[in-house]
Amino acid sequence: MPGAASIVAVLAALLPTALGQANQSYVDYNIEANPDLFSECLETGGTSFPDCESGPLSKTLVCDTSAKPHDRAAALVSLLTFEELVNNTANTGHGAPRIGLPAYQVWNEALHGVAHADFSDAGDFSWSTSFPQPISTMAALNRTLIHQIATIISTQGRAFMNAGRYGLDVYSPNINTFRHPVWGRGQETPGEDAYCLASTYAYEYITGIQGGVDANPLKLIATAKHYAGYDIENWDNHSRLGNDMQITQQDLAEYYTPQFLVASRDAKVHSVMCSYNAVNGVPSCSNSFFLQTLLRDTFDFVEDGYVSGDCGAVYNVFNPHGYATNESSAAADSIRAGTDIDCGVSYPRHFQESFHDQEVSRQDLERGVTRLYASLIRAGYFDGKTSPYRNITWSDVVSTNAQNLSYEAAAQSIVLLKNDGILPLTTSSSTKTIALIGPWANATTQMLGNYYGPAPYLISPLQAFQDSEYKITYTIGTNTTTDPDSTSQSTALTTAKEADLIIFAGGIDNTLETEAQDRSNITWPSNQLSLITKLADLGKPLIVLQMGGGQVDSSALKNNKNVNALIWGGYPGQSGGQALADIITGKRAPAARLVTTQYPAEYAEVFPAIDMNLRPNGSNPGQTYMWYTGTPVYEFGHGLFYTNFTASASAGSGTKNRTSFNIDEVLGRPHPGYKLVEQMPLLNFTVDVKNTGDRVSDYTAMAFVNTTAGPAPHPNKWLVGFDRLSAVEPGSAKTMVIPVTVDSLARTDEEGNRVLYPGRYEVALNNEREVVLGFTLTGEKAVLFKWPKEEQLIAPQ
């Protein structure tokens, strides 16, 4: 089994570096890493279950499964001395040996597979399935796939937990939006759309991890992160640890938080992570408006759900934010604002001082620890061996359909950007020898992105093609940003000249985009583009694979007629090489679509990444497909097929879909099965899709709404739904139904309220607007969601 880099080692190297990044837009705080933080904070997960059969806790209320989770947790916490209480306020909880409470590690990772676990060196528990990164999975436009992946991750996580190698909660999913293309962690997200994509991903992932909505017991505890307004690492020396992001109420409500509303209200996530950055002057982890007014009072966060600080974020409230006068006050401000658990050591190292200075009370600490243990109780932590999920073992990891699903997810996620007809390759063609060139040609762990555990196997493109019917010649040609030696490109050209067809596998990787590292530009690395141009000049058939999570400006390749095909492969996971080879050779047909905009390079050169305003103004050309006023290289939602599809309004759609709706009547309807009337479909956008080509293929679609209703400026369009039809045979047709909810038609006003405006609306199929359904909303405008007044309940100390 190919080895994978230890996530612990990666994070240990990464996080202190991140803490040391200076923020040149602020006072020079001379930021240094908290010297006490990482040795304890980074301990890998794993714990034993409390003994509720014969241990000291067995006769207490916490082991009484008939009692309410809150009461059980409160009873446990009441048994702790103040010192024991303090020692359980961080991610590395010490437990309380005196009463038989084991130590517990809150920090476990599950971004696209089990990670930050206590993996064995070989044999059982030595690996976990590594699925594609979320940016790739979302491109498949298959919500069922997201749920299936999360379900398998939770099964594997439970097996590790039952073996004492993992915890019951995970620091996933990352549901921030990929707003600016330079962001290093965009690969971890579902793309640039908040209302539809990020919210759908949040719902499907969280319910898959937790075992459903209102699951009892919870399978695992998901953590929605990073709340809120976090989408920059170190762009232009603006450190994520000290950034104060200026966000209007309108943008905060419309773009930076709706996915957290869905995660809390609809998916019933049991944990939320507050982010490093500040918003409008207040660090997120000491922001009572975020953590109490919005999350608990407005977003309907579950009772006793807990908030964890990002790792070191409580310390950052003091340094570099300077919001608190010292680390002790930073800890006090954060716990009182609503950060229940500190991923770090500011809480356990400083609460004695905070308590002595009367900045916190025992009740403040008890509230946070009670919330953590109430969630663990809901996950069966104190329920004994007969509790559901306690019988999941390594055999369940091995026997799940995980490896097949990992391949399926990779194959479904690959986007065909350009094709002049060269693809798919066929065995009847004259192509016998393929030159495989580039820094991704023999990629292994490179395909996993970040936050991964050791995979059971890694299939590179080279390995996959070597197992095909083609003769493969391989040379790297160039690395990601530099040539390995002075002759590497000339060697690649010689190899290419002797082949019938060339595949260049390149793009960007975690040497350019990752946590704590943004890109400085969105161009192809010059060394790679130079080699691609030389390969194109040979006049041989040339296929280019653009890999990595963030987009690069591929206009030179799009416009070069000697580049016959261009594929975006993202981070496709452990089976990525096989999926790419199968797409190229026609064993699978591409159907994915971009979930980010591919901007021209000038966009990142002239528009600062710290400008959080979505709407165009002055030098701001507008951000995301909703507001961008320029011409993208490839649009959000772009993706080609190997076959031809036609789409038409479904027969009878004119009667099924009314063309006029009165707002008062719509909002006055009964809504059985829905918590809120605005969650109901106003109409079903129904289209018939026919495969008029000669290849079986999946079909994906996005439904966009546009309107001039409400105040200017008006968005270009916005996404209200998507779907994927599987295996549409040549000559056959299938019907696609995309519900368009009442809420999806609302816009956000300057106060942050979601408002349904009267006027003319259109729902259109894909960017090409193959099918357009027009309708009118009549009557008076109506506020569907009232944004609360922004004020801090807790003053800084």
UniProtKB/Swiss-Prot annotation:
Subcellular location: Secreted
Cleavable signal peptide: 1-20
Catalytic activity as recorded in UniProt: Hydrolysis of (1->4)-beta-D-xylans, to remove successive D-xylose residues from the non-reducing termini
List of glycosylated residues: 23, 87, 142, 237, 326, 391, 404, 442, 479, 521, 617, 644, 657, 684, 706
InterPro entries: BXL, Fn3-like, Glyco_hydro_3_C, Glyco_hydro_3_C_sf, Glyco_hydro_3_N, Glyco_hydro_3_N_sf, Glycoside_hydrolase_SF, Ig-like_fold
GO molecular function, one term: alpha-L-arabinofuranosidase activity
Pathway of action: Glycan degradation; xylan degradation
Catalytic residues, chain numbering: D310
GO terms for biological process, alphabetical: arabinan catabolic process; xylan catabolic process
GO cellular component: extracellular region
Highest taxon in the source lineage: Eukaryota
Keywords: Carbohydrate metabolism, Glycoprotein, Glycosidase, Hydrolase, Polysaccharide degradation, Secreted, Signal, Xylan degradation
Enzyme Commission designation: 3.2.1.37
One Pfam family in the UniProt entry: Glyco_hydro_3_C
PANTHER family, A to Z: EXO-1,4-BETA-XYLOSIDASE XLND, SUGAR HYDROLASE-RELATED
Function: Xylan 1,4-beta-xylosidase involved in the hydrolysis of xylan, a major structural heterogeneous polysaccharide found in plant biomass representing the second most abundant polysaccharide in the biosphere, after cellulose.
Family: Belongs to the glycosyl hydrolase 3 family.
Protein name: Probable exo-1,4-beta-xylosidase xlnD
Organism encoding this protein: Aspergillus flavus (strain ATCC 200026 / FGSC A1120 / IAM 13836 / NRRL 3357 / JCM 12722 / SRRC 167)
